[in-house]
Amino acid sequence: APDGLATWISYQTASGDQLTQSLIGILPVQSPSLLGDPKFCQSHGTRYAYHAGAMANGIASEQLVIALGQQGILASFGAAGLVPSRIETAIQKIQQALPNGTYAFNLIHSPSEPALEIGAVERYLQYGVRCVEASAFLDLTASIVRYRVAGLHQTNGGIEITNRVIAKVSRTEVARRFLEPAPEKYLKQCLEKVWITHEQANLETHVTMADDLTVEADSGGHTDNRPL
């Protein structure tokens, strides 16, 4: 036992019985801020290594994102299912309340309505949204590549990544794509549309598509029946 600590403790039960038991160990009080990886906090500017994920159609609302952000917890606004103009309103409200940027916005893959995905990315870039939670992607798209690569800059110390991506995945092959640089075909598409510069395209060959991964279980909503 540590110096000054007894190896046996005695206590009285509610019924009045006196019991003696051996002391196995002592667990000090742990602050929630000590849990998780401190690198997550450093990367996202949070107090806690927690992330409140996006719930679609604004269920993860501005009020929720703001309340958690004010307490040092990263939360994603539920932008899925909302038109770009509604997303723009949410960006303005959240940025006004959280000028230091402790927030994220959802970017959901919309294969049947690519204009929604493109419109969301355009708003995120226009307003300087620095973190998105990418969800429902079965493959990368030009839009998510555009968001990531448009935030790359060469500095004296290396490559600065201003647009962070948290990828929510349920398949290993999708996780692998986010843990690698963007494929050349998407970089070419972005260059042809003048979404990125040639310098940024070159920088992307040294940068993965995501900073963090969220492992998704199967759900009652849209699902690919393949939880990790």
Where do the model's predicted regions map?
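Active-site entrance/lid segments in N-terminal catalytic domains of soluble metabolic enzymes
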Residues: 1-228
